[in-house]
Each structure stands twice: as C-alpha cells, then as structure tokens.
Amino acid sequence: MYMAMTSSKPLNVVRSFYSVAQNFVDRPLVICDIDHTLFRCSKPLHHYTEFLQKLYSERYRFPVNVEEEALNLMHRAYCDGFIQQTDPAGFRHMVERIEELGGRIVFLTARNIYSHARTLEDFRKVGFEHPETFDIHYTNNVITKGDYIKCMQLDSGFDHVYFIDDQHGYLESVQRECPHIHCFQFQYKY
C-alpha cells in the first residue's frame, strides 16, 4: 500500500483487498465499487495490443493507433462478459474479516439500475453464489459516489466506513462529501 495525494488528504493505493482488511476495526462498513475494482477483463491489455499488432502487420498496411484500439477492444470484451475477479483470495479474506467484526459490505457502481440483471449475471460468472442477496446501489452515472453516499446515508449507523474504487474522481468525491470515510484506490495487477 502506498499513499497518493488528492486535493484534500492522502489516498491509500492498494493492489489487494488484504491491504484494506488490515485497517478494519469493530463493525466496519465497506462500500466497494464493482467494475475494475472487484471485476476486471479476463485478458490484460497487452493481450489485445499484441493481437492487433500481429493482425495489422500481417494483413493491413495502414497506420492505426494500436494502443487506443486495444483499449477499445478490451472494453468491448469486458462489456460482453469476459470478466474475472481482480483478487479472489483477497476479497474472500476481506469478507471474512467484515463478518468476524460484525460489519457489512455494500456495492456501489456507476452502472445503470437497468443493468441490474446483467450485474447479477456478472457476479455469477465470476463465481459468486446468490448475488441477488447482495446490497447493490447504482448511481446511473448521474451523481458522484460521494454525493450518493451522503444523500442515501449509506454510512448511517457505522463508525468505521471504508470506500474502495479504482477511479480517482469518485474517491475525491467521497473524501470531499464524507471526510470521515477511509478511501482506498484499487489498482489491480495482472
């Protein structure tokens, strides 16, 4: 874990849910992002880059921004369901710690509420049983996560709240609107 600076206070950058769980105290509430935090594309970016470089070098002779195309291809694959968990063992450990300490986990995503069925299917795809029992909140990408937590009072009844996301902007919004929440920027490694 290392610290990155935001406009207000240091931000904890982690590569595993183990690092987050080390900070838990009595009755933690964990608010966890889904896309690119809990789930990631099943193939790394270099897979798509190498594929496109080979394809373009063998079949096409025109200039193309391979890195941009690879990123688009990876995003399409992710949206089509080629996903896996970023850190299965670390996430299991974190959930066990939450349960040991009498806490709770909720998921907060920028996805649209109309994608709820797909979200549940994505959870099943990566190995979660009974995702219909999960507490999943959707911002519909129309409100920041900090504003959502504050407006919906997601942190109500908990003294120790932890927020995990991969997007710096969402983390800053939580720090701004809910300064008592401990924020962790998740950066998975292939």
Report each predicted region and the residues it spans.
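A short, conserved beta-to-alpha structural element at the edge of catalytic cores
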Residues: Y56-E69, I181-Y190
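Short, acidic loop-to-helix structural element flanking the phosphoryl-transfer center
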Residues: E58, V64-V106, I113-L120, I143-Y148
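A short, structured active-site edge motif that brings together acidic residues
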Residues: A110, L120, K125-K145
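Non-catalytic pre-domain segments flanking phosphatase-related domains
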Residues: M1-C32, C41-Q53
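Glycine-rich phosphate-binding loop signature in dinucleotide/nucleotide-binding domains
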Residues: F24-D26, L101, Q153-D159
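Structural recognition of the beta-strand scaffold that forms the well-ordered cores
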Residues: V30-C32, C79, I105-T109, D135-H137, ...
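Acidic, Mg2+-coordinating phosphoryl-transfer loop and its flanking beta/alpha structural elements
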Residues: F158-Y190
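Receiver (REC) domain active-site loop signature in two-component systems and cognate sites
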Residues: H36
